[in-house]
Amino acid sequence: MPRFISFEGIDGAGKTTLAKKVYEVLKKKGYNVILTQEPFTREITELIKKAGWNDPVLLTLLFSADRAFHIKWIMEQKPEIVLMDRYFHSTIAYQSVLGLDEKWIEEVNSKFPKPDIVFLLDIKVNEAIKRIRKDDQFNFEEKIATLEAVRKKYLELARKYNFIVLDAMSKIEELTEKTVQIICSLVKCS
């Protein structure tokens, strides 16, 4: 079974950037490592975007179906280490703030491998918005309250599941070094 490492945080926290940097370092060290992102299948992503669905039950089930394909694909690759840019904790954080029962979301996702380490990149919403504005991804005013609630939920999940909380405002080089050190303590890097 590969080691599962997930990167979580609100939009704009820097998950993708950090995951890519860590991937590059581990690859250079000679590890059979893959970097993936959720949602995984293009079809699910497009379906959700086109329909504009905001129903938390439907979204949870779609993300979980996508995750089943994702995990199957990962296992076929036979990696030593899997770096995941979002995993089921994202579903818990985002869908529970829309009113869905957290325990039900956990149950729906209970058959998926648990991550060995979860890194939560914590950032204040106003700082995340500044980063997102650069990419011009969405209407900010609509998202601020949601991101505040999701950040709060992520911090609750961090306490509940013992995530490693990283200050997303730190320099990327520092975050990369710290993250690689933690992963190496788990996989005994050479």
Curated annotation (Swiss-Prot):
GO CC terms of this entry: cytoplasm
UniProt keywords, alphabetically: ATP-binding, Kinase, Nucleotide biosynthesis, Nucleotide-binding, Transferase
InterPro entries: P-loop_NTPase, Thymidylate_kin-like_dom, Thymidylate_kin_CS, Thymidylate_kinase
Entry keyword rRNA-binding: no
Pfam families membership: Thymidylate_kin
Residues binding ATP: G9, I10, D11, G12, A13, G14, K15, T16
Spans through the membrane: none
Top-rank lineage group of the source organism: Archaea
Single GO molecular function: ATP binding
GO biological process terms on file: dTDP biosynthetic process; dTTP biosynthetic process; dUDP biosynthetic process
Catalytic reaction annotation: dTMP + ATP = dTDP + ADP
Its EC number(s): 2.7.4.9
Main enzyme class: transferase
Family membership: Belongs to the thymidylate kinase family.
Name of the molecule in the record: Probable thymidylate kinase
Organism: Sulfurisphaera tokodaii (strain DSM 16993 / JCM 10545 / NBRC 100140 / 7) (Sulfolobus tokodaii)
Gene that this polypeptide is encoded by: tmk1
